[in-house]
C-alpha cells in the first residue's frame, strides 16, 4: 500500500499488440530498435504472438509494427519474423474451419478488420500458392466476430471530423492517421493519456503535433521507458488497480493502514456517474461497485443509487450498450449490496439482489464454474461468484445447488502439485481457488472438511516462489496487472498459512 501511494503509475505487463501499434504510429526519434527487439524476442516458435486462443490481435499488431519500418527491413530477423507470422496466419485461415471466432477482448471486432485492411499487401505477399498456382489474388478472410462495417462507419465519421463515442477513443490507433479536425474532438485526461492507451495516445499526438500538452509527452515517456521500449497494454488505470488491491487488503489484511492519499484519490475520481478504471475512462459498473464497497468499509459516504445506474432489467452492466455482460461485474455489485444489507441494514434493494443472484446462477456452466470477459481464467470468476452467492439474500435450493456445484468443481480441478490452473497451475489461479474454498471451509457444513484439506495441500505449491503467472486479464491483449496479482497471491498464501 505504501508503494502504491508513493507511485500511482499503473503496473501492467508489456503487450506485443500495443508495442507493434506504437512502433507503427509513433513519430518519436527513439522509437524503433527497442520495440523491434521486444517483438522478435516474444514471437512464438510457430510464428505467432500472444497466448493460445488469443493470437490474432497481438500477431496482426506485431506484424503491423515490424512491416511499417522499411529502414529496419534488412535487419536480421525482421523480414523472417513477418514472413513466418503471415504464413502461419494463412495456414489458420485456409485450414479446416477457417479462423476461429474472435475472443471477446476489448474492441477486437474493430481492431482486427482495421489491421487486415492495413496489412492487405503484406499478407498478400506471403499468401501460399493455391493448387500449385502462385500469385492469385485472395483476400485474407475476416474471422467470425469481426465487425468491418462498424470500423468503416467510425472511420467515415473520423474522416469527416465528427466525434465518435468516448468508449472508442481507447482504440484510436485503429483509425490512424487521424485528421486534425477529428483530433480536436478528443480530450486527453489530466495525466495526458487518451483513455489509458499508449498507442491510442500516440495516434492522437501524431494528429495534433505541437498542440499536445506536456503531460501527454510525459505520459508516453513513462510508458516507453518502463520496460525498455516494450509498451504496456494499458497504462494510467490507477482506479482499477487500487480498488482491486484495496478490496483484497481490507478483506485479508484488515490491520494494514490505508494511506490517506489512496482514499483521497478514489474520492476525487468518484462522480455522480460513478468511477471508471482511470482518468479519462467512462464510469463502469465494476469500478463503481468496488469503490462503493471499499469506501463504505473505510467510513466514506456510500452511493448505491449511483451503482443502480448500471442496472439493466436483470443484471448490472459494465457500460451501457455493451455487447457481452460480465459475470464478475454482477458478482462485485452483489457483494456490495450484500455488504449494505448485512453490515448497514439497508434492505431496499432486495428485489435487485435476488434478480442479480438469479442472473449469476444462470451464467454458471454445466461443469460448475463461471467464465468472464475481464479475466480468461474461470478461477477468477468462480471465486467472485462464490463470494457473492454465499452471502446473497435468498438461500434457496437453486442457489445452494449452484454453490455445491462450484465447490465440487474447485475440488475436482486441484492438480497433484496442489495448485490450480487452466493449463499449468499458476500462483494467481491457485490463490483464487484457495480464497473460494476458504469461504466454504470457514462456514462449516457440507464439504467443509474436503475444502480445508484441499487448501492444506496447496501449501507446498506456494512454497515455490519461482512459479510464474501467465497473462490472464483481458484488455485489447491479454495482460498481467502486476500489483493486483501480487496482492492476490499474498492473500492466497495468508489463507493457506491458517490451515
UniProtKB/Swiss-Prot annotation:
InterPro entries: SQ_cyclase_C, Terpene_synthase-like, Terpenoid_cyclase/PrenylTrfase. Gene3D superfamilies: 1.50.10.160, 1.50.10.20. Mg(2+) binds at residues 284, 286. Keywords: Antibiotic biosynthesis, Isomerase, Magnesium, Metal-binding. Optimum pH is 6.8. One of its GO terms (biological process) is diterpenoid biosynthetic process. A motif (DXDD motif) lies at residues 284-287. Its cofactor is Mg(2+). Its EC number is 5.5.1.15. Optimum temperature is 25-30 degrees Celsius. The keyword Isomerase applies. Disulfide bonds: none annotated. It comes from the Bacteria. Disruption phenotype: Mutants do not produce terpentecin. It catalyses: (2E,6E,10E)-geranylgeranyl diphosphate = terpentedienyl diphosphate. Monomer. Involved in the production of the isoprenoid antibiotic terpentecin. Converts geranylgeranyl diphosphate (GGDP) into terpentedienol diphosphate (TDP) by a protonation-initiated cyclization. Belongs to the terpene synthase family. This is Terpentedienyl-diphosphate synthase. The lineage of its organism: Bacteria, Bacillati, Actinomycetota, Actinomycetes, Kitasatosporales. The gene is cyc1.
Amino acid at each position: 500500500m505504501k508503494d502504491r501511494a508513493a507511485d500511482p503509475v499503473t503496473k501492467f505487463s508489456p503487450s506485443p499488440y500495443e508495442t507493434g501499434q506504437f512502433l507503427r504510429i509513433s513519430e518519436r526519434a527513439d522509437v524503433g530498435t527497442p520495440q523491434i527487439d521486444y517483438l522478435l524476442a516474444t514471437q512464438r516458435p510457430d510464428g505467432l504472438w500472444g497466448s493460445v486462443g488469443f493470437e490474432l490481435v497481438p500477431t496482426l499488431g506485431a506484424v503491423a509494427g515490424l512491416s511499417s519500418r522499411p529502414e529496419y527491413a534488412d535487419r536480421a530477423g525482421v523480414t523472417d519474423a513477418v514472413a513466418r507470422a503471415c504464413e502461419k496466419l494463412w495456414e489458420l485461415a485456409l485450414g479446416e474451419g477457417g479462423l476461429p471466432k474472435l475472443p471477446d477482448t476489448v474492441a477486437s471486432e474493430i481492431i482486427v478488420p482495421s489491421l487486415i485492411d492495413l496489412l492487405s499487401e503484406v499478407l498478400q505477399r506471403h499468401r501460399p500458392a493455391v493448387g500449385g498456382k502462385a500469385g492469385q489474388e485472395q483476400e485474407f478472410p475476416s474471422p467470425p466476430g469481426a465487425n468491418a462495417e462498424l470500423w468503416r462507419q467510425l472511420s467515415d465519421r473520423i474522416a469527416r471530423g465528427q466525434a465518435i463515442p468516448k468508449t472508442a477513443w481507447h482504440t484510436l490507433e485503429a483509425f490512424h492517421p487521424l485528421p486534425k479536425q477529428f483530433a480536436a474532438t478528443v480530450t486527453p485526461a489530466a495525466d495526458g493519456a487518451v483513455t489509458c492507451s499508449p498507442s491510442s495516445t500516440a495516434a492522437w499526438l501524431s494528429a495534433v503535433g505541437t498542440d499536445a500538452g506536456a503531460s501527454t509527452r510525459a505520459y508516453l515517456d513513462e510508458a516507453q521507458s518502463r520496460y525498455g521500449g516494450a509498451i504496456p497494454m494499458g497504462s494510467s488505470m490507477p482506479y482499477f488497480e487500487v480498488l482491486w488491491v484495496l478490496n483484497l487488503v481490507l478483506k485479508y489484511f484488515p490491520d494494514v493502514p490505508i494511506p490517506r492519499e489512496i482514499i483521497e484519490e478514489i474520492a476525487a475520481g468518484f462522480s455522480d456517474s460513478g468511477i471508471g478504471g482511470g482518468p479519462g475512462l467512462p464510469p463502469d459498473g465494476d469500478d463503481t461497485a468496488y469503490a462503493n464497497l471499499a469506501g463504505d468499509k473505510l467510513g466514506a459516504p456510500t452511493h448505491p443509487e449511483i451503482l443502480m445506474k448500471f442496472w439493466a432489467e436483470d443484471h448490472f452492466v459494465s457500460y451501457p450498450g455493451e455487447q457481452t455482460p460480465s459475470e464478475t461485474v454482477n458478482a462485485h455489485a452483489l457483494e456490495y449490496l450484500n455488504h449494505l444489507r448485512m453490515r448497514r441494514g439497508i434492505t431496499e434493494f432486495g428485489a435487485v439482489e435476488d434478480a442479480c443472484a438469479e442472473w449469476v446462477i444462470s451464467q454458471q456452466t454445466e461443469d460448475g464454474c463461471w467464465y468472464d470477459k475481464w479475466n480468461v481464467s474461470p478461477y477468477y470468476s468462480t471465486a467472485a461468484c462464490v463470494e457473492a452467492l454465499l452471502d446473497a439474500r435468498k438461500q434457496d435450493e437453486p442457489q445452494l445447488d449452484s454453490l455445491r456445484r462450484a465447490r465440487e468443481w474447485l475440488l475436482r480441478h486441484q492438480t497433484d502439485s496442489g495448485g490450480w490452473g487452466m493449463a499449468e497451475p499458476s500462483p494467481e489461479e491457485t490463490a483464487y481457488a484457495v480464497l473460494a474454498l476458504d469461504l466454504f471451509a470457514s462456514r462449516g457444513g457440507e464439504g467443509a472438511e474436503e475444502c480445508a484439506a484441499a487448501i492444506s495441500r496447496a501449501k507446498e505449491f506456494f512454497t515455490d516462489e519461482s512459479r510464474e503467472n501467465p497473462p490472464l486479464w483481458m484488455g485489447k491483449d491479454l495482460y498481467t496487472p502486476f500489483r493486483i496479482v501480487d496482492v492476490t497471491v499474498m492473500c492466497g498464501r495468508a489463507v493457506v498459512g491458517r490451515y
